[in-house]
């Protein structure tokens, strides 16, 4: 984390945690990370990811494997082993793109349809965030303002976006231009933006995160804060927050 970035975050009085001595401060959380073998395209061991995330200044990290949900017992063991908040999520592949989902306990056939996914998430009192919304949407070969605007408007009509509580404005594996498209889309739709590294390797960790205005100790508190919109994306390479809404 760049010098001064953490210092810019307002410290809170020490709090009595429910189970572990998590950092008593406004929180930086990486909301998008993958580990092997639950995500076949990752080379990250869960323990290595946690160690590196702590070194990078994270207060928590969410494991969001592809269409695979971590069981609570394994998550609890990792929390205790590292005295670090690990959150269980899942990245669901739908016909309308990838959706970061929190609050569900299993993958159910049919979740590739965003409407069915949203129905299950609602029943589970969970939350959905659109991952890397620039994918297959951003115009690569045209810098014409009119065509760029048309691409944003087309992306905003994605059927899945009527169900999400936020868009991933900063993706650690996305280029500056790709993330700029996501930021503009987020502003157009008046949706708050998250940040996640989308880590698949050690070198991915620590690039960006989501800054939460209140402390979080578990998935339920994470879901509540996402629904309340009390967060914004932070680029940890520059230390600069990303805010698209007034």
Region locations from a protein language model:
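Charged catalytic cores and adjacent phosphate/nucleic-acid-binding surfaces used
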Residues: 2-31, 35, 39, 43-52, ...
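Divalent metal-dependent hydrolysis catalytic cores, especially in the metallo-beta-lactamase
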Residues: 30, 50-67, 127-129
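Short, well-ordered beta-to-alpha junction loops that form the rim of enzyme active sites
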Residues: 66, 131-133, 196-199
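Substrate-binding cleft of extracellular glycoside hydrolase catalytic domains
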Residues: 89
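Ordered, amphipathic secondary-structure segments that act as subunit-interaction surfaces
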Residues: 114-115
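Core dinuclear metal-dependent hydrolase active-site scaffold
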Residues: 121-126
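Aromatic-lined carbohydrate-recognition surfaces of secreted/lumenal glycan-active proteins
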Residues: 129-140
């Amino acid at each position: 984390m760049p010098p001064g970035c953490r210092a810019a975050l307002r410290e809170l009085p020490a709090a009595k945690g429910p189970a572990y001595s998590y950092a008593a401060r406004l929180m930086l959380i990486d909301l998008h990370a993958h580990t092997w073998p639950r995500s076949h395209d990752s080379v990250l061991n869960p323990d290595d990811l946690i160690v590196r995330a702590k070194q990078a200044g994270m207060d928590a990290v969410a494991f969001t494997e592809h269409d695979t949900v971590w069981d609570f017992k394994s998550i609890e063991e990792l929390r205790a082993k590292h005295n670090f908040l690990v959150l269980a999520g899942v990245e669901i592949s739908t016909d309308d793109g990838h959706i970061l989902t929190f609050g569900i306990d299993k993958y159910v056939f049919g979740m590739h349809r965003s409407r069915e996914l949203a129905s299950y998430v609602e029943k589970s009192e969970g939350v959905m965030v659109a991952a890397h919304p620039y994918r297959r949407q951003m115009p690569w070969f045209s810098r014409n303002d009119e065509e760029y605007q048309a691409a944003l408007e087309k992306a905003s009509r994605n059927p899945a976006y009527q169900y999400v509580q936020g868009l991933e404005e900063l993706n650690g594996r996305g280029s500056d231009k790709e993330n700029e498209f996501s930021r503009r889309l987020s502003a157009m739709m008046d949706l708050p933006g998250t940040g996640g590294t989308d880590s698949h390797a050690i070198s991915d960790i620590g690039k960006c995160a989501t800054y939460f205005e209140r402390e979080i100790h578990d998935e339920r508190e994470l879901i509540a804060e996402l629904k309340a919109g009390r967060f914004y994306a932070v680029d940890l390479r520059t230390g600069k927050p990303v805010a698209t809404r007034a």
